[in-house]
Amino acid sequence: YNPHNKTYYMVTTNVGVGNFFVKTQDPFGEWSDPIMLPEVTGIDPSFFFDEDGKAYLVNNDDAPDNKPEYSGHRTIRVQEFDVNADKTVGPRKILVNKGARPEDKPIWIEGPHLYKINGNYFLMSAEGGTAGWHSEVIFRGDSPTGKFTPWKNNPILTQRQLDAERPNPVTCAGHADLVQTREGDWWAVFLACRPINNTFENLGRETFMMPVKWSEDGFPYMTQGDDLVPVIVRREGVKRDESATFGNFEMNDGFDGQTLGMEWMTLRAPATGLYSLSQTPGYLTLKCDSVSASEKKVPAFICRRLQHHKFECSTRMLFCPQSKAE
């Protein structure tokens, strides 16, 4: 959110197409069409809106001169963003080359975010890839364009060194973002996995959150040493919402409403026109066609995410194909 023009931005990467953003002054209303960022190569773009009205975009990019010294050698770069022209301007500058400890040849410095906290600028990035070596590292500087110095106790979040046989393990933790509550507390949201049998991850990457601590020398961190990422975080004064769909629960959808519930998902984009709740009341009718899941199109496919390692589900299906393509 940019308070200077009262505008919300969502910026991301469409792999194979490029980086783009959409914007609005009402997040519950209409958003703009995608606005491409052709000068921004690489992935994982993130906006930073400074107190002086200037804006910046940071992201993961290639090694200097596109000449990597090893596999996974990447950089974090920054460029000023013109909020009036909706485009990046000026030179692209390298903020981080390789990672927090270049001598160790770290891989995949990515997912950067810029913050200004208590007069200091912080650059936070994921490092180590998204598997078991996943982590988060932090740098501090005097301006959005650097120079940034890594914290001596990086990483600020990881579970890579812990015993794989520990109970209720959380693994692959990284790609974090920071948020401050109205009360002034800092929290982190990040990606991690809950493996089954300490090996497999049938739930994929999930979103976690935990409170942020601050070091004596003024750096934020989530874990140090053998600190565990908790499966459940309890906060004083906050009552658990028993109606939420976590823990053991049962649900049934009779498809008797006017719209699908928020838990239902489609592939790539909304499947508008490919399903109906009114054609046969009490049923979800899929309008099959010849689109396969491997094509860059929207198939007649509706699903919901797995939330547990073990579960049971069933559905009643009436299927009368009219052609081989169905």
Where do the PLM segments sit?
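Carbohydrate-active catalytic/glycan-binding domains of CAZyme proteins
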Residues: Y1-E326
